[in-house]
């Protein structure tokens, strides 16, 4: 019998960024109570030796499962120390992997009532519409003109600590091009 392998997309992530994300998730689950219904599975509750933690986020009858890994093969850079994140959308027996942008967008659509395309219809029907969104990571594009006008009028309040973003968790902070000053004034160029 031949080996049967299953391939998963695992986003390389910084160890400290994973620790920060886990502590934000736990804070909002147990202290601020903004993450109701979420389930956190510790590494010792998993049978897989590489799983560091799992966070299950319910989305109606489906759920988003964010799994963090440790002890993976290191990447081509020195700082890729074998830490990673996989993001799955599960509904009954079906599961598929999603990217961090889509994961944040799904969380935003399910949990946060903010000013969006449907807000004008809600306002006409007499429902209360709030132009402030607590989870800005769920917006992956520039909003309509009405949204921009309302956000210019109302200053958003900062939430401390911020709600955990999946995109921020998987963001590669080392491979961003470094901005350096050019030799003429304050013009910036991409450094190497």
UniProtKB/Swiss-Prot annotation:
Residues 75-114 are annotated as: RNA-binding. Residues 151-180 are annotated as: SOCS box-like. It comes from the Viruses. Its main location: host cell. Residues 171-172 are annotated as: Membrane association. GO terms for cellular component: host cell cytoplasm; host cell plasma membrane; membrane; virion component. Residues 164-192 are annotated as: Disordered. Keywords: AIDS, Host cell membrane, Host cytoplasm, Host membrane, Host-virus interaction, Membrane, Metal-binding, Phosphoprotein, RNA-binding, Ubl conjugation, Ubl conjugation pathway, Virion, Zinc. Residues 54-72 are annotated as: Interaction with host APOBEC3F and APOBEC3G. A motif (BC-box-like motif) lies at residues 144-153. Residues 151-164 are annotated as: Multimerization. It holds the Pfam family Vif. The record marks 150-151 as: Cleavage in virion (by viral protease). The modification Phosphoserine is found at residue 165. Residues 40-44 are annotated as: Interaction with host APOBEC3G. It is found in: Host cytoplasm; Host cell membrane; Virion. Processed in virion by the viral protease. Highly phosphorylated on serine and threonine residues. Belongs to the primate lentivirus group Vif protein family. Vif-defective viruses show catastrophic failure in reverse transcription due to APOBEC-induced mutations that initiate a DNA base repair pathway and compromise the structural integrity of the ssDNA. In the absence of Vif, the virion is morphologically abnormal. HIV-1 lineages are divided in three main groups, M (for Major), O (for Outlier), and N (for New, or Non-M, Non-O). The vast majority of strains found worldwide belong to the group M. Group O seems to be endemic to and largely confined to Cameroon and neighboring countries in West Central Africa, where these viruses represent a small minority of HIV-1 strains. The group N is represented by a limited number of isolates from Cameroonian persons. The group M is further subdivided in 9 clades or subtypes (A to D, F to H, J and K). HAMAP family: HIV_VIF (MF_04081). The BC-like-box motif mediates the interaction with elongin BC complex. This is Virion infectivity factor. The gene is vif.
């Amino acid at each position: 019998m031949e080996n049967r392998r299953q391939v998963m997309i695992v986003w390389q992530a910084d160890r400290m960024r994973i620790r920060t994300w886990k502590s934000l998730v736990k804070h909002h689950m147990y202290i601020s109570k903004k993450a109701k219904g979420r389930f956190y599975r510790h590494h010792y509750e998993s049978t897989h030796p590489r799983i560091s933690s799992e966070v299950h986020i319910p989305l109606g009858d489906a759920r988003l499962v964010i799994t963090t890994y440790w002890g993976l093969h290191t990447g081509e850079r020195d700082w890729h120390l074998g830490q990673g994140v996989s993001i799955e959308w599960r509904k009954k027996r079906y599961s598929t992997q999603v990217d961090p942008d889509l994961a944040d967008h799904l969380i935003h659509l399910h949990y946060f009532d903010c000013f969006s395309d449907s807000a004008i219809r809600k306002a006409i029907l007499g429902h209360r519409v709030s132009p402030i969104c607590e989870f800005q990571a769920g917006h992956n594009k520039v909003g309509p003109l009405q949204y921009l006008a309302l956000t210019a009028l109302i200053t958003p309040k900062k939430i401390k600590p911020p709600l955990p973003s999946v995109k921020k968790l998987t963001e590669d902070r080392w491979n961003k091009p470094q901005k350096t000053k050019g030799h003429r004034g304050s013009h910036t160029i991409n450094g190497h």
